[in-house]
């Protein structure tokens, strides 16, 4: 997008003058993930605006922008972004439920993806104990509640899972090995799985 046709300055200016949905002050999380094709000669601002508009064109995106009785549109987008960053499609709905369950009881979210966002290390598996102490409003290990905004642009599936999470009492989840993500309401069970995860990671299972 930037490399083929627009300068960095043009893109920066375009994103600073977008027409955003109500309740949003910047475009973070609103750039709908999709393949885009723009006609030759289109302005950077028009191209950027079409990417924002695509969000509300999506049925799930449009529903999210309406908010609900418990969360604003921005809060829902923030939740959806964490769901996207934390899991794969098959687990989106369960991860969303974990987030809601933790918020409901006032439990810190402690989502690794929010710390990876601070560190610009998305996709990492390992999170050091030291990194969980970083002083940032996005650090859900230190800060209760949701971070101040989205940490990525969620897919339509992640948005749908956020709006319609599966029922369950889970409070914890962990990927013990590639393709093996487990959910539980028991801290003791989670702790035993964490030991299993550590053994697998040290054995190179995540390489």
Task: Mark where each language-model region is.
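Membrane-embedded segments
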Residues: 1-2
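Bacterial extracytoplasmic/cell-wall-associated proteins, especially those involved in peptidoglycan
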Residues: 7, 13, 17-207
């Amino acid at each position: 997008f930037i490399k083929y046709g627009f300068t960095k300055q043009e893109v920066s200016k375009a994103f600073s003058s977008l027409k955003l949905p109500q309740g949003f002050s910047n475009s973070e999380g609103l750039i709908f993930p999709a393949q885009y094709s723009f006609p030759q000669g289109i302005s950077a601002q028009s191209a950027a605006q079409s990417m924002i508009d695509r969000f509300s064109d999506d049925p799930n995106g449009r529903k999210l922008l309406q908010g609900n009785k418990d969360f604003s549109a921005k809060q829902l987008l923030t939740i959806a972004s964490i769901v996207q960053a934390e899991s794969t499609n098959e687990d989106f709905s369960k991860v969303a439920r974990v987030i809601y369950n933790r918020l409901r009881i006032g439990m810190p979210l402690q989502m690794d993806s929010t710390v990876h966002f601070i560190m610009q290390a998305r996709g990492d598996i390992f999170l050091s104990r030291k990194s969980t102490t970083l002083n940032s409003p996005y650090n859900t290990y230190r800060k209760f509640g949701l971070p101040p905004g989205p940490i990525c642009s969620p897919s339509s599936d992640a948005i749908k899972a956020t709006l319609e999470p599966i029922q369950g009492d889970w409070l914890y989840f962990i990927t013990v090995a590639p393709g093996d993500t487990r959910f539980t309401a028991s801290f003791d069970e989670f702790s035993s799985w964490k030991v299993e995860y550590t053994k697998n990671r040290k054995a190179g299972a995540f390489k």
